[in-house]
Amino acid sequence: MGAYKYMQELWRKKQSDVMRFLLRVRCWQYRQLSGLHRAPRPTRPDKARRLGYKAKQGYVIYRIRVRRGGRKRPVPKGATYGKPVHHGVNQIKFARSLQSTAEERAGRHCGALRVLNSYWVGEDSTYKFFEVILIDPFHKAVRRDPDAQWITKAVHKHREMRGLTSAGKKSRGLGKGHKFHLTIGGSRRAAWRRRNTLQLHRYR
């Protein structure tokens, strides 16, 4: 096995003594830092490389801290107005994952960069920590790379805001196989519309 495979196996056993100690120390370290900061290198180089990271110019890693738990509806003094069925304020669950929230924050902070992907690096009772891979679309090392130049096109601006990253697609229910029948045709809405539209084809 190569070195990256050994690292992957270490990360798969998160309950081992080594990883439990390491994750506790790292979570303490991350809590002392700001909620969004640039990491000098990926904490999990094996995972980052599987997601498209390359250790060369134009690639950046940002570490994001996201508060765990549900999402309270942002209304003044709990006044939602309308019918009682929609009065919920406290026990509201956000439609997207905390990982996609981390990607969004990184994309907002680094507006000129493109979000490629992200991965989990730790969590405690209050926070989850993710590392986000960002790419500079104007760097020559990226523009001249046939494997990475797709992200330089304008259509990929702020893909994290539109649910086009891996974490975003997961929240949209997109995927292959029998578990993803609700989104055949591109989205939940497209699948619902097709199944609920009566088509009487004309006999010719």
From Swiss-Prot:
Coiled coil: none annotated. GO terms for molecular function: RNA binding; structural constituent of ribosome. GO terms for biological process: cytoplasmic translation. Keywords: Cytoplasm, Ribonucleoprotein, Ribosomal protein. It holds the Pfam family Ribosomal_L15e. It comes from the Eukaryota. GO terms for cellular component: cytosolic large ribosomal subunit. Its main location: cytoplasm. It is found in: Cytoplasm. Belongs to the eukaryotic ribosomal protein eL15 family. Component of the large ribosomal subunit. The ribosome is a large ribonucleoprotein complex responsible for the synthesis of proteins in the cell. Component of the large ribosomal subunit. This is Large ribosomal subunit protein eL15. It comes from Anguilla japonica (Japanese eel).
